[in-house]
Amino acid sequence: MAKAVALLLAAIAASAVLVQVECDAPVEKSFNKALLAPVDKRLDEATQAINEAADSVVAAAPPAKKDEVEAATWKRRMFAFAALGMAQGDEKKVAATSLAYKKAAKAVLDAAPADKFKLMDESFKVAAMEVIVS
């Protein structure tokens, strides 16, 4: 229970850092995703790919290790979201970062269930290194 609460608090803290809120800005009633800038679309696609990969790793985990795997995937997920957040403002960095994490997520999704956790750990580390180098 304490782990779950700690994970939830860590996720909330990380999302508070990553989410930008505009105060007193008029909200468009008919929001059209087709009007999103290419950069925003890349970030959305990368975020979705990261979440799908992490969810598949947790789903493939054996019941005895589910809590441990979930904690580790949250850690990788938060690092990935932080990297995406740090890339904002530079279109080339956004492109490199989103591509690196989409490749890593695809590798995890294509992996056998027994290999998903190890592959996520390794491929997300490689993606993070690609981001640092770019």
From Swiss-Prot:
Keywords tagged on the record: Signal
Additional information: On the 2D-gel the determined pI of this unknown protein is: 7.1, its MW is: 19 kDa.
Protein known as: Uncharacterized protein OsI_031781
Superkingdom: Eukaryota
Signal peptide: 1-16
Taxonomic placement: Eukaryota, Viridiplantae, Streptophyta, Embryophyta, Tracheophyta
Organism: Oryza sativa subsp. indica
